[in-house]
Amino acid sequence: MLMTMRKHGITLAVFAALATGLTALVNGLTTSTIERQAARQQMQLLDQVVPPDLYNNQLLDECYLVTDPALGSDAPHRLYLARKDGTPVAAAIETTAPDGYAGAIDLLVGADFSGNVLGARVTSHHETPGLGDKIELRLSDWITHFSGKSLRSDNDMSWAVKKEGGMFDQFTGATITPRAVMNAVKRTAGYLKKNLNALEKMPHCGDSSHE
């Protein structure tokens, strides 16, 4: 009887060890798959605001944490530095429009260091369906009109909605939302124009002391 109990105990221990190992393996594979999918989705978004033919480095490996009032909040924002043969040529940077109609609007903006906007996309918002939500690419191409626009100075009067004498369309029944997004893109382009030399001194994404 004692021998039988020992055999059962050993068998159970072996099965438990195998089950634990299999669970760890599955979890590891699942985590790796999720991380790859997240990286792929992030690159797809980055490609929309910084054309891939402009750079030849790995954007996800050149991620810095930037904190500045021009980016709309006190929270650190991720900045991805694009290089061509080692020379910085542009950046994609998270930014916030704090003054949306229904709260903060989060964006990703791509621009070079001369004030030229390469692209912009809204990543999160709470604007009114049917009105302010036209900032989403899936509902309107309005957000694409920032591509190719240039910021000559902080006081560039063309950076306004058309009803205020500027070059950007407002939405029917909704001016606050497009104005907020436009001003956020403007501030972000201005930030990149002024801060090229400071970017590489910023902490890297993943630095535990800044998370």
Swiss-Prot record:
GO molecular function, one term: FMN binding
Needed cofactors: FMN
Keyword rRNA-binding: no
GO process terms (BP): electron transport chain
Keyword tRNA-binding part of the UniProt annotation: no
Entry EC number(s): 7.-.-.-
Function: Part of a membrane-bound complex that couples electron transfer with translocation of ions across the membrane.
Name assigned to this protein: Ion-translocating oxidoreductase complex subunit G
Source organism phylogeny: Bacteria, Pseudomonadati, Pseudomonadota, Gammaproteobacteria, Enterobacterales
